[in-house]
């Protein structure tokens, strides 16, 4: 999947960019509080893209992906 297509999909879920990292951008869903890194590659594997979308769209946040201070 193209990175830009993944970004469009997660932004349509209501996710926002929270920071730029060295090799990844971090997006957070303010409704669930879940954050996920998005790699800065032109192409992102389909399995990884589906995992990112599933995690950010999930109504139940996963403990390891949520920071307590957010």
Predicted stretch roles:
Residues 1-14:
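Polyanion-binding surface elements
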Residues 26, 37:
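Conserved beta-strand positions that form and line the central face of beta-propeller blades
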Residues 40-70:
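C-terminal structural segments of small proteins and small subunits
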Residues 32-36:
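Short, charged/polar, Gly/Pro-enriched secondary-structure boundary elements
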Residues 27-31:
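Active-site beta-strand termini and strand-to-loop segments that position acidic
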Residues 23:
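A generic "binding-loop/recognition-motif" signal
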Residues 17-20:
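Short beta-strand
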């Amino acid at each position: 999947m193209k990175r830009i297509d993944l970004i469009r999909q997660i932004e349509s879920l209501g996710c926002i960019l929270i920071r730029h990292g060295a090799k990844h951008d971090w997006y957070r869903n303010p409704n669930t509080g879940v954050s996920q890194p998005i790699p800065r590659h032109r192409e992102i594997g389909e399995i990884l893209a589906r995992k990112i979308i599933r995690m950010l769209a999930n109504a139940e946040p996963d403990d390891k992906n949520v920071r307590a201070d957010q």
